[in-house]
Amino acid sequence: MRFFKYENGRVSRPSSRFLLTLTVSIFAYFHTFTIAHSAPRHLFTETPAQKSERLSWWTHDRFGMFIHFGLYAIPARGEWIKMTEPVSDEKYDEYFRLFNPNLFDARDWARRAKAAGMKYAVLTTKHHDGFCLWDSRFTDYKVTNTPFGRDIVREFVEAFRAEGLHVGFYYSLLDWHHPDFTIDMCHPGRPKMAKKWEFYGTSDKDFPTLNRNRDMARYRQYMKDQIRELLTNYGKVDILWMDFTYPEPNGKTHLDWDSEGLLRLVRSLQPQVIVNNRMGLYDTADGWDFVTPEQFKVCEWPTVRGERVHWEACQTFSGKWGYHRDAMTWKSDAELIELLVHSVSKGGNLIMNVGPNARGEFDDRAKRKLEAYARWTRLNGESVYGCTQAPERFRAPDGTLLTYAPKTHRLFIHLLCYPGKDLVVDFGDEISFARFLHDGSEIKFSQIESCPENKLYRHGGEGLWQLSLPPLQPDVVNPVVEIILKNKNTLMHQWQ
């Protein structure tokens, strides 16, 4: 994957290869999350300290599971299939009549998420196709009207809470099934154009004709009714993941959703819920809690108006969110672990997606990837949980990432490319002890004056340290070196 600069909600210099693989949601997100440079409006009275406390569990836990599940698991070609191919309404209705994930076991999902080291989970209660995974009284287009007949959302929250995980709801602002949702550039009913992914160039005069019998006011009320259901009938909801706003051109803005009214409703029902940034309230200071770079790695801690913000990278195992039977682009174990470490090393979270198949199970490939996370987090979890970006005075050697635990004053060196020899670090005079995290074995270190190979030079004998690593990489993916820093107020680390 490539690196990009993320500043004020914009991503600079994406590669051509990256642009070719963007989904519509990413495309719209990158082009619409522009931040006004004027003083932001405040919708609520929460102080920064209160917000920090509200998000404290989330910024500590760092790692979550995204679950994209719905009718699109049957065609097994991704969650945007109705838009991208496109699939006719008649064909998609057939998936509704056939939907019966009879091997679904929310307890199995929850156990696998917990074993993988994930601390929270977010389920697609409704994706863009409009199909609802709960027994909503405001639509017939719901899971309880399929052959399956069970409330998946209820089983999800009960199972994940039982395993001690926080639970969240993804809710699509788009709805391709609702008769009042107006047709726009991201709607399967848009005028057909020459190219499959060509949205621009459609004449504005086409849309009033297409939408003459549609009423967004009625759809807005439908959304609010459903959000009220989700935030009233399922107990405490920890995260609300709304998706998405795309104003240009012939799209939808925050006014189409009445995002302010929607967020006020959310806060009135669940004051402690954490909400992402995709409702389009970019000119506010508190219309969102965290930003959501999708399927790319940031090169530095994201900022808005020059200030660092809470953020969460959302990533997939293979490039698709919904189940994709024939995907050939599955990431390696090392790549997946690096995504987690990379997010934490830049002060953020990672939510990694699983797309269950049409039987309701995680397929074997997904299970193997979750097991890879499980092996790594069991041994190295303390290098991500409660960790953040290292202080600037610590420079990451080439081929490594650094994470830092403020409470224990520990620095962690993640060896993405094993050096196969001594590792030179520029950590000043702060190293007290060094060891591999996976087995606790000591790593000897000594002070040196220079390292021409890494273009590191110090005169006076301070700053450079040589860690004596074994010549062969330990039998673990992405080994981690724990550095206990000198701090008279920090007790020696106690192994659990």
Located regions from the model:
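Bacterial N-terminal signal peptides
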Residues: L19-T32
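Short, low-complexity intrinsically disordered segments enriched in A/P/G/S/L with frequent Arg
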Residues: R13-S15
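Intrinsic structural disorder/low-complexity segments
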Residues: R17, T32-T34, L71
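Mature catalytic domains of secreted/periplasmic carbohydrate-active enzymes
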Residues: H37-Q496
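Generic short amphipathic/hydrophobic targeting helices enriched at N-termini
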Residues: E7, L20-L22, V477
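Short, aromatic- and cysteine-enriched interfacial helices/patches
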Residues: F3-F4
